[in-house]
Curated annotation (Swiss-Prot):
GO terms for molecular function: GTP cyclohydrolase I activity. It holds the Pfam family GCHY-1. The keyword Magnesium does not apply. One of its GO terms (biological process) is tetrahydrofolate biosynthetic process. The gene is folE2. InterPro entries: GTP_cyclohydrolase_FolE2 (IPR022838), GTP_cyclohydrolase_FolE2/MptA (IPR003801). Converts GTP to 7,8-dihydroneopterin triphosphate. Keywords: Hydrolase. It comes from Syntrophus aciditrophicus (strain SB). The record marks 145 as: May be catalytically important. This is GTP cyclohydrolase FolE2. NCBIfam families: PRK13674.1-1 (NF010200). It catalyses: GTP + H2O = 7,8-dihydroneopterin 3'-triphosphate + formate + H(+).
Length: 255
């Protein structure tokens, strides 16, 4: 049978990334409290494609994933990419793994327990003379506007916010530690389950601890700077403004 992908392309244009997106795949991640956690991940995989090849072989990405079924994690990440490079005869390979991670949280007053989900990601690339790997997590928090509190006789506008942290690191660390750092760097935390006594507590706590979006990214960055295990980080915060039809945003990264 003729292999169309291997035919020569005459347009002389290299493709930096070509591959498959949105592969739903079960993986196992380490859980600080329970040991391991089984999650359903969405995986993107790419390779470079030299200008003289018409196309890549999409099925080979899935074949490699199947070889590592049950063993897709931080430790095997670059092994998988090296296998992809070899199987597709590519100079570079890239992979992005996004998954929901669940932590049991306890309501601050009633003690009610519930599961809270956080979107986490592993991403990186592997080439002959270069490797890169990042861990990312999106943490929901709340913010109360300091300006609104200052000028209002009663109350202040508040909103849910997403803080996204991405890090490069030397040694293993727990996702829970980054999540906790972020949650305690904003006006307040987000919970899946709150009783009335808890709602009162988190409302008053947020009001007593107002922050701009700028304060949140600086607070998180200041505490990440204290962690010598991290070689690089980025922090972005987005407030879903309750009194505007737009969002507030701030970004900082380690220089």
């Amino acid at each position: 049978m003729i292999d169309i992908q291997n035919l020569e392309d005459h347009r002389k244009i290299n493709i930096q990334k070509v591959g498959v997106k949105g592969i739903n795949y079960p993986i196992v991640v380490l859980d600080k409290a329970k040991g391991t956690q089984h999650v359903n991940a969405s995986i993107n995989m790419y390779v470079d494609l030299p200008h003289h090849f018409k196309g890549t072989h999409m099925s080979r990405f899935i074949e490699v994933l199947n070889e590592f079924r049950g063993e897709i994690n931080i430790r095997t990440f670059h092994t998988i990419l090296e296998k992809v490079r070899d199987k597709l005869k590519a100079e570079s390979a890239h992979m992005e793994i996004t998954f929901p991670y669940f932590i049991e949280k306890t309501a601050p007053v009633s003690g009610a327990k519930s599961l809270m989900d956080y979107i986490c990601a592993f991403s990186g690339m592997n080439a002959e003379n270069k490797k890169d790997f990042l861990v990312g997590v999106v943490v929901p928090v709340t913010t109360v506007c300091p300006c609104s509190k200052e000028i209002s006789c009663m109350g202040a506008h508040n909103q849910r916010s997403h803080v996204t942290v991405k890090v490069r690191f030397k040694k293993f660390f727990w996702l829970e530690d980054i999540i906790r750092l972020v949650e305690t760097s904003a006006s307040g935390e987000v919970y899946s389950l709150l009783k009335r006594v808890d709602e009162k507590y988190v409302t008053e706590q947020g009001y007593a601890n107002p922050m701009f979006v700028e304060d949140v990214v600086r607070n998180v960055a200041e505490r990440l700077n204290e962690n010598s295990n991290l070689t690089w980080y980025s922090v972005e915060a987005e407030n879903f403004e309750s009194i505007h039809n737009h969002n507030a945003y701030a970004y900082v990264e380690k220089e």
